[in-house]
Amino acid sequence: MSAVKWVHSSRRGFYGCAPAVLLVNCVTGVTGELSLLHVVSRETTVLFFGAPDLCEGVDRVNFSPDLIALVRSKVSGSSIFDQLKADTTALEKVRELGFAAPTQTRVIAVANQKGGVGKTSTAVNVAAALAEAGLRVLLIDADPQGNASTAFGLEHPEGEPSVYDVIVEGKPISQVAKVTELGENLQVVVSNIDLSSVEIDLLEAVGRQSRLREAVRNYLIEVNRSGGKRVDYVIIDCPPSLGIITINAFVAAGEVLIPMQAEYYALEGLALLTRSIDRIAKVYNPALHVSMIALTMFDKRTMLARDVESEVKTYFPHATLETKIPRSVRIAEAPSYGEPVVTWDPRSTGAVAYKRLAQEISMRGITQPGVAPKEN
Protein backbone atom coordinates (compact mmCIF):
# COMPACT_ATOMS: atom_id res chain seq x y z
CA MET A 1 0.00 0.00 0.00
CA SER A 2 3.02 2.31 -0.02
CA ALA A 3 2.18 3.47 -3.53
CA VAL A 4 -1.40 4.35 -2.64
CA LYS A 5 -2.32 7.95 -1.86
CA TRP A 6 -5.41 9.57 -0.34
CA VAL A 7 -6.63 12.21 -2.74
CA HIS A 8 -9.60 14.05 -1.26
CA SER A 9 -13.10 13.74 0.08
CA SER A 10 -15.89 15.21 -1.99
CA ARG A 11 -19.41 16.35 -1.18
CA ARG A 12 -20.37 15.47 -4.75
CA GLY A 13 -18.83 12.06 -5.05
CA PHE A 14 -17.00 11.14 -8.22
CA TYR A 15 -18.59 11.02 -11.66
CA GLY A 16 -22.00 10.38 -10.23
CA CYS A 17 -20.90 8.08 -7.37
CA ALA A 18 -22.22 8.63 -3.88
CA PRO A 19 -20.09 11.03 -1.79
CA ALA A 20 -17.06 9.13 -0.58
CA VAL A 21 -13.43 9.40 0.39
CA LEU A 22 -11.55 8.60 -2.79
CA LEU A 23 -8.43 6.49 -2.93
CA VAL A 24 -6.97 6.63 -6.41
CA ASN A 25 -4.31 4.71 -8.29
CA CYS A 26 -3.59 5.65 -11.89
CA VAL A 27 -2.50 3.46 -14.74
CA THR A 28 -2.02 5.39 -17.96
CA GLY A 29 -2.55 3.88 -21.36
CA VAL A 30 -5.17 1.39 -20.27
CA THR A 31 -7.82 2.77 -22.60
CA GLY A 32 -5.81 5.18 -24.69
CA GLU A 33 -7.66 8.41 -23.91
CA LEU A 34 -8.58 7.49 -20.35
CA SER A 35 -6.77 6.16 -17.31
CA LEU A 36 -7.80 3.38 -14.98
CA LEU A 37 -8.72 4.63 -11.53
CA HIS A 38 -8.94 2.43 -8.48
CA VAL A 39 -11.60 4.07 -6.32
CA VAL A 40 -12.06 3.02 -2.70
CA SER A 41 -15.10 4.46 -0.96
CA ARG A 42 -16.03 4.07 2.68
CA GLU A 43 -18.14 1.06 1.83
CA THR A 44 -16.75 -0.70 -1.20
CA THR A 45 -13.92 -0.91 -3.68
CA VAL A 46 -14.56 -0.48 -7.39
CA LEU A 47 -12.54 -0.04 -10.53
CA PHE A 48 -13.34 3.10 -12.46
CA PHE A 49 -12.14 5.18 -15.38
CA GLY A 50 -11.31 8.87 -15.42
CA ALA A 51 -9.50 11.60 -17.29
CA PRO A 52 -5.68 11.51 -17.09
CA ASP A 53 -5.42 15.01 -15.58
CA LEU A 54 -7.23 13.73 -12.49
CA CYS A 55 -4.22 11.51 -11.85
CA GLU A 56 -1.59 14.25 -11.74
CA GLY A 57 0.55 14.04 -8.63
CA VAL A 58 -0.83 10.66 -7.60
CA ASP A 59 1.54 7.73 -7.08
CA ARG A 60 1.34 5.11 -9.82
CA VAL A 61 0.61 1.44 -9.25
CA ASN A 62 1.32 -1.13 -11.94
CA PHE A 63 -1.59 -3.54 -12.02
CA SER A 64 -0.86 -6.90 -13.60
CA PRO A 65 -1.74 -7.35 -17.31
CA ASP A 66 -4.25 -10.04 -16.36
CA LEU A 67 -6.09 -7.65 -14.02
CA ILE A 68 -6.11 -4.90 -16.64
CA ALA A 69 -7.49 -7.32 -19.24
CA LEU A 70 -10.19 -8.44 -16.82
CA VAL A 71 -11.24 -4.88 -16.00
CA ARG A 72 -11.35 -3.89 -19.65
CA SER A 73 -13.52 -6.88 -20.50
CA LYS A 74 -15.95 -6.07 -17.67
CA VAL A 75 -16.12 -2.29 -18.03
CA SER A 76 -15.37 -1.46 -21.65
CA GLY A 77 -18.61 -1.07 -23.56
CA SER A 78 -20.67 -0.40 -20.42
CA SER A 79 -22.92 2.65 -20.37
CA ILE A 80 -20.87 4.30 -17.61
CA PHE A 81 -17.62 3.80 -19.47
CA ASP A 82 -19.09 4.97 -22.78
CA GLN A 83 -20.59 8.10 -21.22
CA LEU A 84 -17.40 8.98 -19.37
CA LYS A 85 -15.34 8.52 -22.49
CA ALA A 86 -17.80 10.64 -24.51
CA ASP A 87 -17.74 13.40 -21.87
CA THR A 88 -13.95 13.46 -21.81
CA THR A 89 -13.76 13.63 -25.59
CA ALA A 90 -16.38 16.41 -25.66
CA LEU A 91 -14.49 18.47 -23.07
CA GLU A 92 -11.28 18.14 -25.04
CA LYS A 93 -13.11 19.32 -28.16
CA VAL A 94 -14.56 22.32 -26.33
CA ARG A 95 -11.10 23.31 -25.13
CA GLU A 96 -9.64 22.80 -28.58
CA LEU A 97 -12.24 24.84 -30.48
CA GLY A 98 -12.72 27.58 -27.90
CA PHE A 99 -15.51 30.15 -27.89
CA ALA A 100 -16.10 32.79 -30.55
CA ALA A 101 -16.75 36.37 -29.45
CA PRO A 102 -19.64 38.06 -31.28
CA THR A 103 -18.93 41.13 -33.38
CA GLN A 104 -21.56 43.03 -31.39
CA THR A 105 -23.59 42.44 -28.25
CA ARG A 106 -26.09 39.61 -28.60
CA VAL A 107 -29.29 40.01 -26.57
CA ILE A 108 -30.97 36.63 -26.14
CA ALA A 109 -34.32 35.96 -24.46
CA VAL A 110 -34.55 32.42 -23.08
CA ALA A 111 -38.25 31.63 -23.16
CA ASN A 112 -40.89 28.94 -23.02
CA GLN A 113 -44.43 29.46 -21.74
CA LYS A 114 -44.36 25.94 -20.28
CA GLY A 115 -42.63 25.54 -16.92
CA GLY A 116 -40.28 22.74 -15.95
CA VAL A 117 -38.52 22.46 -19.31
CA GLY A 118 -35.05 23.48 -18.15
CA LYS A 119 -35.43 27.12 -19.16
CA THR A 120 -33.66 28.65 -16.16
CA SER A 121 -31.06 25.87 -16.04
CA THR A 122 -30.27 26.62 -19.67
CA ALA A 123 -30.04 30.38 -19.09
CA VAL A 124 -27.74 30.18 -16.07
CA ASN A 125 -25.47 27.43 -17.35
CA VAL A 126 -25.02 28.97 -20.79
CA ALA A 127 -24.27 32.31 -19.13
CA ALA A 128 -21.74 30.72 -16.77
CA ALA A 129 -20.04 28.71 -19.52
CA LEU A 130 -19.67 31.80 -21.72
CA ALA A 131 -18.27 33.80 -18.80
CA GLU A 132 -15.82 31.02 -17.91
CA ALA A 133 -14.60 31.18 -21.51
CA GLY A 134 -13.66 34.84 -21.04
CA LEU A 135 -16.73 36.49 -22.54
CA ARG A 136 -18.57 39.21 -20.64
CA VAL A 137 -22.18 38.34 -19.84
CA LEU A 138 -25.09 40.16 -18.23
CA LEU A 139 -27.82 37.79 -17.04
CA ILE A 140 -31.21 39.36 -16.35
CA ASP A 141 -33.46 37.30 -14.10
CA ALA A 142 -36.91 38.33 -15.34
CA ASP A 143 -38.84 35.60 -13.54
CA PRO A 144 -40.59 36.61 -10.26
CA GLN A 145 -39.55 33.26 -8.78
CA GLY A 146 -35.93 34.43 -8.90
CA ASN A 147 -34.52 30.98 -9.63
CA ALA A 148 -31.71 32.32 -11.82
CA SER A 149 -30.61 34.53 -8.92
CA THR A 150 -30.69 31.57 -6.54
CA ALA A 151 -28.65 29.49 -8.98
CA PHE A 152 -25.69 31.82 -8.38
CA GLY A 153 -26.16 32.02 -4.63
CA LEU A 154 -27.33 35.64 -4.81
CA GLU A 155 -29.77 36.87 -2.20
CA HIS A 156 -32.87 38.53 -3.61
CA PRO A 157 -35.28 39.31 -0.75
CA GLU A 158 -38.47 41.24 -1.27
CA GLY A 159 -37.96 45.00 -1.29
CA GLU A 160 -34.30 45.02 -2.36
CA PRO A 161 -33.23 46.56 -5.71
CA SER A 162 -34.06 44.15 -8.50
CA VAL A 163 -35.20 43.94 -12.10
CA TYR A 164 -38.53 45.33 -10.87
CA ASP A 165 -36.84 48.65 -10.15
CA VAL A 166 -35.27 48.59 -13.61
CA ILE A 167 -38.56 48.01 -15.44
CA VAL A 168 -40.98 49.99 -13.26
CA GLU A 169 -38.88 52.69 -11.61
CA GLY A 170 -36.32 53.21 -14.38
CA LYS A 171 -33.35 52.42 -12.16
CA PRO A 172 -30.10 51.92 -14.15
CA ILE A 173 -29.02 48.31 -14.56
CA SER A 174 -25.53 49.21 -13.31
CA GLN A 175 -27.02 50.07 -9.91
CA VAL A 176 -28.82 46.75 -9.61
CA ALA A 177 -26.52 44.15 -11.22
CA LYS A 178 -24.57 41.93 -8.83
CA VAL A 179 -21.17 40.39 -9.52
CA THR A 180 -21.06 36.59 -9.25
CA GLU A 181 -18.20 34.36 -8.13
CA LEU A 182 -17.11 34.27 -11.77
CA GLY A 183 -16.14 37.93 -11.41
CA GLU A 184 -16.86 40.86 -13.68
CA ASN A 185 -17.37 38.52 -16.62
CA LEU A 186 -20.78 37.57 -15.23
CA GLN A 187 -23.16 39.96 -13.54
CA VAL A 188 -26.77 39.21 -12.64
CA VAL A 189 -29.75 41.53 -12.39
CA VAL A 190 -31.62 39.70 -9.65
CA SER A 191 -35.36 39.21 -9.39
CA ASN A 192 -37.74 38.82 -6.48
CA ILE A 193 -41.44 38.56 -5.72
CA ASP A 194 -41.89 42.31 -6.32
CA LEU A 195 -41.86 41.56 -10.05
CA SER A 196 -45.15 39.67 -9.77
CA SER A 197 -47.04 42.99 -9.50
CA VAL A 198 -45.52 44.52 -12.62
CA GLU A 199 -48.63 43.79 -14.73
CA ILE A 200 -50.69 46.07 -12.48
CA ASP A 201 -47.97 48.67 -11.92
CA LEU A 202 -47.46 49.16 -15.67
CA LEU A 203 -51.14 48.90 -16.60
CA GLU A 204 -51.41 52.50 -17.82
CA ALA A 205 -47.72 53.26 -18.30
CA VAL A 206 -46.57 54.79 -21.58
CA GLY A 207 -44.26 52.52 -23.56
CA ARG A 208 -44.65 49.76 -21.00
CA GLN A 209 -43.58 47.07 -23.47
CA SER A 210 -40.18 48.70 -24.13
CA ARG A 211 -38.98 49.52 -20.60
CA LEU A 212 -36.41 46.73 -20.52
CA ARG A 213 -35.11 47.53 -24.02
CA GLU A 214 -34.32 51.10 -23.00
CA ALA A 215 -32.63 49.90 -19.82
CA VAL A 216 -30.43 47.44 -21.71
CA ARG A 217 -29.48 49.99 -24.36
CA ASN A 218 -28.59 52.58 -21.72
CA TYR A 219 -26.49 50.02 -19.85
CA LEU A 220 -24.54 49.05 -22.97
CA ILE A 221 -23.92 52.71 -23.79
CA GLU A 222 -22.79 53.34 -20.20
CA VAL A 223 -20.31 50.44 -20.36
CA ASN A 224 -18.92 51.66 -23.68
CA ARG A 225 -18.54 55.24 -22.45
CA SER A 226 -16.73 54.09 -19.31
CA GLY A 227 -14.12 52.29 -21.40
CA GLY A 228 -14.96 48.97 -19.78
CA LYS A 229 -14.82 45.60 -21.46
CA ARG A 230 -17.62 45.26 -24.00
CA VAL A 231 -20.61 43.18 -22.98
CA ASP A 232 -20.72 40.20 -25.34
CA TYR A 233 -24.04 38.70 -24.22
CA VAL A 234 -27.18 39.86 -22.47
CA ILE A 235 -29.21 36.79 -21.54
CA ILE A 236 -32.76 37.27 -20.25
CA ASP A 237 -34.41 34.44 -18.31
CA CYS A 238 -38.12 34.92 -19.01
CA PRO A 239 -41.02 33.76 -16.81
CA PRO A 240 -43.08 30.77 -18.04
CA SER A 241 -45.85 32.97 -19.41
CA LEU A 242 -46.53 35.45 -22.21
CA GLY A 243 -47.32 38.48 -20.05
CA ILE A 244 -45.84 41.98 -20.03
CA ILE A 245 -42.50 40.81 -18.59
CA THR A 246 -41.90 38.35 -21.42
CA ILE A 247 -43.05 40.94 -23.95
CA ASN A 248 -40.46 43.34 -22.49
CA ALA A 249 -37.81 40.66 -22.91
CA PHE A 250 -38.83 40.03 -26.53
CA VAL A 251 -38.80 43.73 -27.36
CA ALA A 252 -35.34 44.07 -25.79
CA ALA A 253 -33.85 41.02 -27.51
CA GLY A 254 -32.63 40.29 -30.98
CA GLU A 255 -32.88 36.53 -30.57
CA VAL A 256 -34.98 33.97 -28.76
CA LEU A 257 -33.56 30.70 -27.44
CA ILE A 258 -36.31 28.17 -26.75
CA PRO A 259 -35.46 25.23 -24.47
CA MET A 260 -37.99 22.42 -24.90
CA GLN A 261 -38.47 18.86 -23.76
CA ALA A 262 -38.57 16.09 -26.31
CA GLU A 263 -42.28 15.34 -25.94
CA TYR A 264 -45.29 15.91 -28.19
CA TYR A 265 -47.03 18.42 -25.92
CA ALA A 266 -43.91 20.54 -26.26
CA LEU A 267 -44.37 20.63 -30.03
CA GLU A 268 -47.82 22.20 -29.61
CA GLY A 269 -46.42 24.75 -27.19
CA LEU A 270 -43.59 25.54 -29.59
CA ALA A 271 -46.05 26.39 -32.35
CA LEU A 272 -48.00 28.75 -30.06
CA LEU A 273 -44.83 30.44 -28.80
CA THR A 274 -43.39 31.04 -32.26
CA ARG A 275 -46.67 32.59 -33.41
CA SER A 276 -46.60 34.96 -30.43
CA ILE A 277 -42.99 35.88 -31.19
CA ASP A 278 -43.90 36.62 -34.81
CA ARG A 279 -46.70 38.96 -33.71
CA ILE A 280 -44.44 40.84 -31.31
CA ALA A 281 -41.75 41.12 -33.98
CA LYS A 282 -44.20 42.65 -36.47
CA VAL A 283 -45.50 45.24 -34.02
CA TYR A 284 -42.57 46.12 -31.75
CA ASN A 285 -39.26 44.56 -32.80
CA PRO A 286 -38.58 43.57 -36.43
CA ALA A 287 -35.14 42.21 -35.47
CA LEU A 288 -36.62 39.57 -33.16
CA HIS A 289 -36.43 35.98 -34.36
CA VAL A 290 -36.20 32.45 -32.99
CA SER A 291 -32.51 31.82 -33.54
CA MET A 292 -32.09 28.67 -31.46
CA ILE A 293 -34.07 25.74 -30.09
CA ALA A 294 -32.42 23.48 -27.52
CA LEU A 295 -33.76 20.05 -26.64
CA THR A 296 -33.56 19.48 -22.88
CA MET A 297 -34.08 16.50 -20.57
CA PHE A 298 -33.31 14.43 -23.63
CA ASP A 299 -33.27 10.63 -23.35
CA LYS A 300 -31.59 9.32 -26.48
CA ARG A 301 -32.67 5.77 -25.65
CA THR A 302 -36.34 6.48 -26.36
CA MET A 303 -38.00 6.52 -29.75
CA LEU A 304 -40.20 9.41 -28.59
CA ALA A 305 -37.20 11.69 -28.03
CA ARG A 306 -35.76 10.87 -31.43
CA ASP A 307 -39.13 11.39 -33.15
CA VAL A 308 -39.61 14.79 -31.52
CA GLU A 309 -36.07 15.80 -32.46
CA SER A 310 -36.81 14.85 -36.06
CA GLU A 311 -40.04 16.88 -36.06
CA VAL A 312 -38.35 19.96 -34.63
CA LYS A 313 -35.54 19.74 -37.18
CA THR A 314 -38.09 19.40 -39.98
CA TYR A 315 -39.87 22.64 -39.09
CA PHE A 316 -36.86 24.54 -37.68
CA PRO A 317 -33.86 23.13 -39.54
CA HIS A 318 -31.60 26.13 -39.00
CA ALA A 319 -32.63 26.97 -35.44
CA THR A 320 -32.38 23.50 -33.87
CA LEU A 321 -29.11 23.13 -31.98
CA GLU A 322 -27.15 19.92 -32.37
CA THR A 323 -26.21 19.74 -28.70
CA LYS A 324 -28.90 18.12 -26.56
CA ILE A 325 -29.13 18.41 -22.78
CA PRO A 326 -29.70 15.02 -21.10
CA ARG A 327 -31.70 14.34 -17.99
CA SER A 328 -29.26 14.82 -15.13
CA VAL A 329 -29.58 14.77 -11.36
CA ARG A 330 -26.47 16.94 -11.19
CA ILE A 331 -28.22 19.77 -13.06
CA ALA A 332 -31.10 19.67 -10.57
CA GLU A 333 -28.81 19.45 -7.52
CA ALA A 334 -26.45 22.29 -8.39
CA PRO A 335 -28.72 25.27 -7.47
CA SER A 336 -29.01 24.01 -3.89
CA TYR A 337 -25.27 24.72 -3.59
CA GLY A 338 -25.60 28.19 -5.11
CA GLU A 339 -23.82 27.33 -8.34
CA PRO A 340 -24.72 26.32 -11.89
CA VAL A 341 -23.70 22.78 -12.73
CA VAL A 342 -20.93 23.92 -15.11
CA THR A 343 -18.98 25.24 -12.11
CA TRP A 344 -20.34 23.00 -9.36
CA ASP A 345 -19.56 19.68 -11.05
CA PRO A 346 -17.75 20.65 -14.28
CA ARG A 347 -17.00 17.08 -15.40
CA SER A 348 -20.53 15.76 -15.00
CA THR A 349 -22.49 14.81 -18.09
CA GLY A 350 -24.91 17.71 -17.65
CA ALA A 351 -22.10 20.25 -17.26
CA VAL A 352 -20.28 18.96 -20.33
CA ALA A 353 -23.50 19.18 -22.36
CA TYR A 354 -24.11 22.78 -21.32
CA LYS A 355 -20.52 23.74 -22.15
CA ARG A 356 -20.98 22.24 -25.60
CA LEU A 357 -24.29 24.06 -25.97
CA ALA A 358 -22.73 27.39 -24.97
CA GLN A 359 -19.91 26.83 -27.43
CA GLU A 360 -22.37 26.04 -30.21
CA ILE A 361 -24.30 29.21 -29.39
CA SER A 362 -21.08 31.25 -29.49
CA MET A 363 -20.10 29.79 -32.86
CA ARG A 364 -23.49 30.78 -34.25
CA GLY A 365 -22.77 34.28 -33.03
CA ILE A 366 -20.37 34.79 -35.91
CA THR A 367 -23.36 35.13 -38.26
CA GLN A 368 -26.27 35.88 -35.92
CA PRO A 369 -27.55 39.47 -35.82
CA GLY A 370 -27.26 41.17 -32.45
CA VAL A 371 -28.45 44.38 -30.85
CA ALA A 372 -25.75 47.02 -30.73
CA PRO A 373 -26.05 50.04 -28.44
CA LYS A 374 -27.11 53.17 -30.30
CA GLU A 375 -26.71 56.67 -29.00
CA ASN A 376 -29.42 59.18 -29.81
For each feature predicted by the language model, list its residue ranges:
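P-loop NTP-binding core
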Residues: S9-C17, L22-N376
